[in-house]
Amino acid sequence: MEDSDSAAKQLGLAEAAAVAAAAAVAAAAAAAAGGEAEEPVLSRDEDSEEDADSEAERETPRVTAVAVMAAEPGHMDMGAEALPGPDEAAAAAAFAEVTTVTVANVGAAADNVFTTSVANAASISGHVLSGRTALQIGDSLNTEKATLIVVHTDGSIVETTGLKGPAAPLTPGPQSPPTPLAPGQEKGGTKYNWDPSVYDSELPVRCRNISGTLYKNRLGSGGRGRCIKQGENWYSPTEFEAMAGRASSKDWKRSIRYAGRPLQCLIQDGILNPHAASCTCAACCDDMTLSGPVRLFVPYKRRKKENELPTTPVKKDSPKNITLLPATAATTFTVTPSGQITTSGALTFDRASTVEATAVISESPAQGDVFAGATVQEASVQPPCRASHPEPHYPGYQDSCQIAPFPEAALPTSHPKIVLTSLPALAVPPPTPTKAAPPALVNGLELSEPRSWLYLEEMVNSLLNTAQQLKTLFEQAKHASTYREAATNQAKIHADAERKEQSCVNCGREAMSECTGCHKVNYCSTFCQRKDWKDHQHICGQSAAVTVQADEVHVAESVMEKVTV
């Protein structure tokens, strides 16, 4: 059995090589001779086969015939072998049918593009080319221009990704119409790879261990629209996930799955279109006889709040270091982004140093500015200019900063003044004539050597006067606080005494009224007044007269005393 299979394979390969040689020779002769008659080159000798191959290689449009056997898939192969005799060719023809696949080179040499056409694809048996079968080109074609040919059983050819089709077919022959693409291929914009059955009107869905069938035409907003059939009952998506034990999730788009993916994927690809919650269509109302407007669900994105900080980090201005060279001691001025100037170390000047100095500002990590043209002039010392500038230095700004005064021990007698002029980085400073600076002013007063001490002495005296005034005010406030406490205590004692005098004569409680006759006795109620009236009626008028007389005498004495004073 194996011998017969190998013999059949050899016969088939030989027949395929013969057909390929014949087709190549015919194409070469037609291209070379033009209108001349075709030469019969169907010889089966090896010499004619070599001549045909050499002529085919010299021609620009290379045409190669590929034989496809309708035998077992394992016997599909292409190659050139020794040609058999006429008897073997007849046996091969009786064994299987041969289909010719023509490959034409239609592009440039660097494109490596092939197009294919099937001349007799209907003769290929279905069990050999079931679905799609890839045929690889063997030694009969150039290895640099190898490609992949996909043959359908219905005769259509689908080119692989990246291949270019010709402007017009170069090889005559029957061209079968292309097969219509699946719905998934028509869409082309889906994020996931779906089976073509996803475009059916009914989809098998599952939530945990419960399965059902989703009807697309009955899909509503999720909470409404019973579109899932499970057994004989209809459920909405939320009811279906609740029945499966996922009611607490409240997210049916991710709880219910189709083909292993949640329904959210189908919605993102536009395969499912859920309705809005305010939709009043027939599906959402669970009444297919109604005809209301359909409002689709529109996904929304969360808006960013205005007060949210941007995700990109804000670049912080690094402080700039100013180094004065030459100098006897290394001193660095640090200019912060807010404009503050801080110094590290003591600033000293060498009397014998050169007049011209260079000030270099280094900024980290970016390239810093270069400050040049610092000149030491014969002028008086200036006070600080409000801790330099409110903003950091940048290239292109022309400004100046004046250094604060220092103690006289650290300064020469000439009181030099250092002025830093900002220049762009890597720029040559233009020569500018120096001008004598005006004398320094502090609060409108010229600051010189004797006047500076006078100014400081006046400041000290004013501070002492202010301290004395503050001490006096403090003593006055202290005495006032003492008097206030004494007055408060006296008023409290007086109030307690009055409270005791206004108690009821009968029972001792707090009095609410007094006797209208003498105004000296107080009562808490009319009951106490009636009870005490038996004793009080005898002394009510007498006590009043005596009291009044005593009062008059007392007043006269007080008046006499006042006159004497």
UniProtKB/Swiss-Prot annotation:
* Binding-site residues, Zn(2+) 2: 515, 518, 536, 540
User: Where do we find the motif Nuclear localization signal here?
Assistant: 301-316
Summarize the impact of residue 226 to A. Reduces transcription activation
Give start and end of each SAND domain: 193-273
Q: Which PROSITE patterns match?
A: SAND (PS50864), ZF_MYND_1 (PS01360), ZF_MYND_2 (PS50865)
Result of altering residue 498 to K: In a primary colorectal cancer
Q: Name one GO biological process term.
A: anatomical structure morphogenesis
Consequence recorded when altering residue 397 to F: In a primary colorectal cancer
Q: Which GO terms describe its molecular function?
A: DNA-binding transcription factor activity, RNA polymerase II-specific; DNA-binding transcription repressor activity, RNA polymerase II-specific; RNA polymerase II transcription regulatory region sequence-specific DNA binding; zinc ion binding
Write down which residues bear the modification named Phosphoserine.
Answer: 176, 448
What keywords tag this UniProt record? Cytoplasm, Developmental protein, Disease variant, DNA-binding, Epilepsy, Intellectual disability, Metal-binding, Neurogenesis, Nucleus, Phosphoprotein, Secreted, Transcription, Transcription regulation, Zinc, Zinc-finger
Q: What is the effect of changing residue 364 to N?
A: In a primary colorectal cancer
Question: What Pfam families does the annotation carry?
Answer: SAND, zf-MYND
In the record, Phosphothreonine modifications are located at 171, 179, 432
Q: Which SUPFAM superfamilies match?
A: HIT/MYND zinc finger-like (SSF144232), SAND domain-like (SSF63763)
Which InterPro entries did the record assign?
SAND-like_dom_sf, SAND_dom, TF_DEAF-1, Znf_MYND
Spell out the Pro residues composition-biased ranges: 169-181
**Mutagenesis / variant outcome for changing residue 252 to Q:** Abolishes DNA-binding
Disordered: annotated span: 34-62, 162-190
Please share what else the UniProt entry notes about this protein: Defective DEAF1 could confer a growth advantage to the mutated cells influencing the development and progression of neoplasia, e.g. in the case of colorectal carcinomas. Subcellular location in colorectal carcinomas (cytoplasmic or nuclear) is a prognostic factor that identifies a subgroup of patients with reduced survival. In addition, changes in the subcellular location correlates with the proliferative status of the cells.
Q: Describe the disease involvement stated in the record for this chain.
A: Vulto-van Silfout-de Vries syndrome: An autosomal dominant disorder characterized by intellectual disability, poor speech, motor delay, and autistic features. Most patients have additional non-specific features, including hypotonia and gait abnormalities, seizures, which may be refractory, high pain threshold, and sleep disturbances. Neurodevelopmental disorder with hypotonia, impaired expressive language, and with or without seizures: An autosomal recessive disorder characterized by psychomotor delay, epilepsy, intellectual disability, speech impairment and dyskinesia of the limbs. Patients also manifest autistic features and other behavioral abnormalities.
Name assigned to this protein: Deformed epidermal autoregulatory factor 1 homolog
Species: Homo sapiens (Human)
Query: What lineage is on file?
Result: Eukaryota, Metazoa, Chordata, Craniata, Vertebrata
